Amino acid sequence: LQSKTESGLPYIVLREAIVNAFIHRSYKVNSPVQIIRYSNRIEITNAGYSLKSIESIGEPGSLARNPHIAAIFHDTNLAETKGTGIKSMRKLLMKSDMMPPTFESSHAANTFTLRLLLHHLINEKDHHWLMKFDAFLLSDNQKTALIFLREVGALDNLSYRQLTGVNILQSSMDLRKMVSSEILQQKGNSKKNTYYVPGKIFLASLEVHQQE
């Protein structure tokens, strides 16, 4: 098997993401695991919200919804050691200079989504685009978030923390700064439904970049 897909995504990362969906999905819900390949990302959605909090995904310890299925994947070496799969994915993506995975878990919809961006960390074109924000003295974490927002279209506090590894206090400060600078526009007014979309400055930078 090839070590990487055509997009440069490590094969093991994609395999682990798919296996993870089958190990942790809810089989009480009669719906297939959905694997959607967009031009810039892969999203894998399975029935069943995460039994672990999103913040603790990737930390030691595993809560398998289907232990017998998990055992089969582990015994056949199709899955990493219990509780280490996400951690291994992050390491491999970092080694390949790609963004870390992001996750969404919904109790209401009873679904879990894992997202893999097919984008290498800030390349030459990205650097050129990000120069348009130099006046705002953005951190590397904020710049990474802007690349994510450009590729996906929306960003929330949780996604920011998953991308950067900062705590909730720092992520809130970073996002507020970009909102006050009109780089981002805030939508929603509560912790559960607040997210961010491109603001006036962000949209203007894209228009200029496309004309160059």
Model-assigned labels for residue ranges:
Residues 1-212:
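C-terminal regulatory or interaction extensions
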